[in-house]
Amino acid sequence: MDNAVDRHVFYISDGTAITAEVLGHAVMSQFPVTISSITLPFVENESRARAVKDQIDAIYHQTGVRPLVFYSIVLPEIRAIILQSEGFCQDIVQALVAPLQQEMQLDPTPIAHRTHGLNPNNLNKYDARIAAIDYTLAHDDGISLRNLDQAQVILLGVSRCGKTPTSLYLAMQFGIRAANYPFIADDMDNLVLPASLKPLQHKLFGLTIDPERLAAIREERRENSRYASLRQCRMEVAEVEALYRKNQIPWINSTNYSVEEIATKILDIMGLSRRMY
């Protein structure tokens, strides 16, 4: 019997709701269900909390199925309103805090917006992350080769293999200064490592992709073009992989990995520190 059903899932917080989303998604991924996600950040007063409660109740009365509610709310009066709803409510942070409180014999001091908000203690980290994002945008797709020595990692690969989204994820999620450099069709007749990258070989990391997947992605961008042909994609991938092997550049095939997985593998292989924000 197939127990998979459609469920409405709420992620609610008096802050950004990022924590509720991340932990809630992790939990829901364990179940064979199709979900409709509703994220409601900054539920900071009773009026908004009552509106959220009404939204949860309306879905319950429409579907006859209790919405799942993952919440992270500091103020008890706001929590109380959400708990009065027809949803199945789970305080995802408290589920972890309570046993830790017992283990450490220490009372928590919850403060709204502490996880992702700005305060004097994390302002320098925030500025560093913004600087990493600015750097990554300025060094996307080989736009600029200046200050490459300031990069923490330089991603290489053919067009449309995932360099840009991975670079941006590294910058936004971990504050990593990630440049990326494309190998284009004109490079393939005599593909060599550019002179500007040779002194930085310890920072280079290659991405590759299955030619069939690459062709499908390129076809969406330039239909019926040589650029998107399977023959061209096979040739480019083969040449780039040979370059990686020749120059002993670490690399992975991005075909079956999400951006999050690719970024995590890069951090691990390159020994880069994970800095969460």
UniProtKB/Swiss-Prot annotation:
Q: NCBIfam families, from UniProt?
A: PRK05339.1 (NF003742)
According to UniProt, the reaction catalysed is: [pyruvate, water dikinase] + ADP = [pyruvate, water dikinase]-phosphate + AMP + H(+); [pyruvate, water dikinase]-phosphate + phosphate + H(+) = [pyruvate, water dikinase] + diphosphate
Q: Which InterPro entries match?
A: Kinase-pyrophosphorylase, PSRP
Q: What is its EC number?
A: 2.7.11.33, 2.7.4.28
Name the enzyme group at the top EC level.
transferase
The family assignment reads: Belongs to the pyruvate, phosphate/water dikinase regulatory protein family. PSRP subfamily.
By its UniProt entry, which PANTHER family does this protein fall under? PYRUVATE, PHOSPHATE DIKINASE REGULATORY PROTEIN 1, CHLOROPLASTIC
Gene that encodes it: ppsR
Provide this UniProt record's keywords sorted from A to Z.
Kinase, Nucleotide-binding, Serine/threonine-protein kinase, Transferase
Q: What is the lineage of its organism?
A: Bacteria, Pseudomonadati, Pseudomonadota, Gammaproteobacteria, Enterobacterales
Q: What is this protein called?
A: Phosphoenolpyruvate synthase regulatory protein
